[in-house]
Structure formats: structure tokens, C-alpha cells
Amino acid sequence: GTAGIEATYEDVLRGEKGEQIVEEDVLGRVRRVVEERAAPVPGDNVHLSLDLELQTVAEEALLASMGEADSPRGVAIAMNPQTGEILAMVSLPTYDNNIFVEGVTQSDWERWQDPHRPLINHAVSDAVPPGSVFKVVVASAALQEGVLTPQTQLNCSGRIEVPNRYYPNDPGQAQPFYCWNEAGHGAQDVVGGLAHSCDVFFYKAGGGFEETSFKGLGVERIAEYARLFGLGEPTGVELPAESGGLVPTADWK
């Protein structure tokens, strides 16, 4: 195999070649085996956790979502949260592995020059921001550190104004950050913040909010807990070229 699971388990799947001395006729046809020097050893089988039906559904759903968002590439992964088994994994755009067996044509090569890199498994090789799933990290860290209690209420008006550190007294220099729900979610506790995926709640939980003197986690504690959750390190998935990602810190920035 040249990629994916087949590349990872090439030594297991390949087996061992046999060796014979044979007699051939003038047309190259084998007439008889003169000597059997070594019998071939078949390779072992590898059983995957992938669910074929779920894999098909995931690919169809991802294609539909990419079309709706007018996005040129996307990833979908379905896992068993109890075991970590990967039940479906889709990376688009993609390519056909069999091309490497049959021979790469000029048109194949030109198609692979797509800037969205179809030869890359974006599910494991890209390093991208985690998005709203990171709210679970912030929520857990804030509760563990006592920044939040289960009863703490933070208000979401749909946006938060962050003062410019170089012009703290000039409101015109402040930077607004918006919640996905621009109407706001109002006052809510951490369960509500997670249930609504409220951006402003976690802006405040992570960075604090000067108007109410609320002290958030801060960059270093967020980074510490991100690493405790395993971010910034390879997962060890049995696929080649996995990216470990990056947990940014104040020093890194």
C-alpha cells in the first residue's frame, strides 16, 4: 500500500514471496516446476472498525454540507466515544488509490495540483482550529480552577467589546467579538453556555470581562488544560502523516 491503513500495515499485509525454478517453452509458458525453493507466505488480514454504511452516509452528508456552504474541502469523522474506534472518516477532495497500481496519467497529475490538496488526508494531516468543541475544554478548566461554579451566570448580549491594550481608554479602538446568535442568549450558567454553544459566554470564561471585574482563565491556564486534554500532540491513530497540532501560548504569539 502507498497510503492510509495499507501503508501503515504494509509489512503485515504483504506477506512473503515464494521462489520456484520452472521450465518454460519458447512462448514463456510454464511447462513444469523443476524445484520449489520457498513457498509463498500470504499476508495477514487487518480488520477495520469502519462501518461501511455509516462511511457512505458520512460522505454523502459531507458533500451536501460542502455544497450548502460553498466549501471546496471538508472532513467528517464519526467515533465510538467509549472506545475511540473510528467508525467513519471522510476527507474531501480525495483520490482513487488504485491509480497508483494502474499507472498515473498526465490528467491524473494535473488534477492533483488542486490547491485544496486531494492527496492529503485532511482528517489527520491538517492542523486547524478546533472550533466550538474547544468550549468543553474551557468549561472543564474554568470549573476545575474555580473561575466558574455550576451556578455562575454570565450574560450574553450578542457581542463583547474587548478594549485595545494600547488605547484602553478609547472606546473607538475596542474590538467587538460576536456570538453566533447576534440577539444574545441572556444570562446563563455553564450548562446553558454549552447547550447553546454561546460564544460570548466562553469569551468571558476564557478571557474575563473588565466591565464586571470578572477574571477569566487566561491564556496560560487555557493552554495548560488544552494539553491535559491531549491537544497539541498526535493521537496515535494508525494512519501516516498525522499532525500533532499546536497549543498557542503568549510566548508563542
Placement of each model-derived feature along the sequence:
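Conserved, well-ordered alpha-helix/loop/beta-strand core segments that scaffold catalytic motifs
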Residues: 30-74
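Small/polar-residue-rich segments within soluble enzyme cores
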Residues: 1-43
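Generic short beta-strand
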Residues: 74-77, 87
